[in-house]
Amino acid sequence: MYGTCHLSTHKLKIGIVVGEVSGDTLGVQLMRSFREQGIDAEFEGIGGPQMIAEGFNSFYPMETLSVMGIVEVLKDIKKLFAVRDGLVQRWREHPVDVFVGIDAPDFNLRLSKSLKEKNLPIRTVQYVSPSVWAWRQGRVKGIKATIDLVLCLFPFEKNFYEQHSVRAAFVGHPLAKLLPLNNSLVEAKQALGLNPEKTYIALLPGSRKGEVERLLPMLLGSAEILLKKYPDVEYLIPAISDVRKKQIQDGIQSIAPQYAQKLHVLENQDQESKIGRQVMNASDIVALASGTATLEAMLLHRPMVSFYKLNTLTYIIAKLLVKIQYYSLPNIIAGKKVIEELIQKDANPERLAHEIEKLMNNETAKIQMMQHFSMHKQLISGNTEDPVQAIMTLIQ
């Protein structure tokens, strides 16, 4: 274990690996928090554009790890192993004081294991717990052996780890603290230059190429059904890059060209822009792929329908392993069904259109929004620890 005097004689070196946009956001917030607390540190590993803009030294593109699904991962396994081995070699020659794996558990837990197997003097932290409480609970043994500290976003996760004698800290979800409890829909619409009097529905097919390929046709199909019935409603689709924007626009021209004027594709204006969040915030109803974005929509207090369609083989395998009743974070946090979840065959244009239409009823939407508000308050009222202090306590 490192002593305080060891740390005071050199600049702290922190290795971080993130695999997607949400991890990039957590990573840049962590970097800023270290600096705001006057801790002299340098950061390296795999980071996203926000982290790189903050001075992060990224050895590989973040997109290298943006692979979802068991079948998809198997296709890229050699590349992922090469990246892992490259990082281990780098940190064997130039050790960091602590490695913080942010989300991306399948990659980061293996990387932490490799660092421990090489007996490198590196403390290991997993920021964002893998869903061990949901499926593959046997992984908690591996986490106990290879991870020195788990930083949990939700209180029920810390309780789970403590039951298994794993060191954990509940640090709260940064978004719960960042997003205000009082949130104006009218102001959000005006911020995007939208008409506050109009009804907008957000369609979020995801940020990865494969997700958009799989989910956009269903979203556009549901919009077609609803536009025939509600021609004045307009649709907002966020795109995180020019490449994704072109993919979505090509999809619209292929699937629903007659409604192109009602389907607006919006993209990030700058590095700090969060177009997905802005679009959800400016929408009366949100339809989105189950994942971190469902938590964001909940914290914005927007009525939503969640869905997911996996590769068929991936879904069959996952179904055998998953031990929880719900898939979306709002339902998992609440421990009950708060939002509708459409999985696999239920995720089709007709069913999605039907669920969106139900939320057009103001009373139904209002009930869901009140539940979101209540859960938001719960996530910021708990006793949370500062992630930087939790990490510093570990390495001192």
UniProtKB/Swiss-Prot annotation:
Gene Ontology molecular function: any one: phospholipid binding
Gene Ontology biological process terms, A to Z: lipid A biosynthetic process
Record keywords, A-Z: Glycosyltransferase, Lipid A biosynthesis, Lipid biosynthesis, Lipid metabolism, Transferase
Annotated catalysed reactions: a lipid X + a UDP-2-N,3-O-bis[(3R)-3-hydroxyacyl]-alpha-D-glucosamine = a lipid A disaccharide + UDP + H(+)
UniProt keyword annotation of Glycosyltransferase present: yes
Record EC number: 2.4.1.182
SS bonds (residue pairs): none
Role noted for this protein: Condensation of UDP-2,3-diacylglucosamine and 2,3-diacylglucosamine-1-phosphate to form lipid A disaccharide, a precursor of lipid A, a phosphorylated glycolipid that anchors the lipopolysaccharide to the outer membrane of the cell.
Name of the protein this chain belongs to: Lipid-A-disaccharide synthase
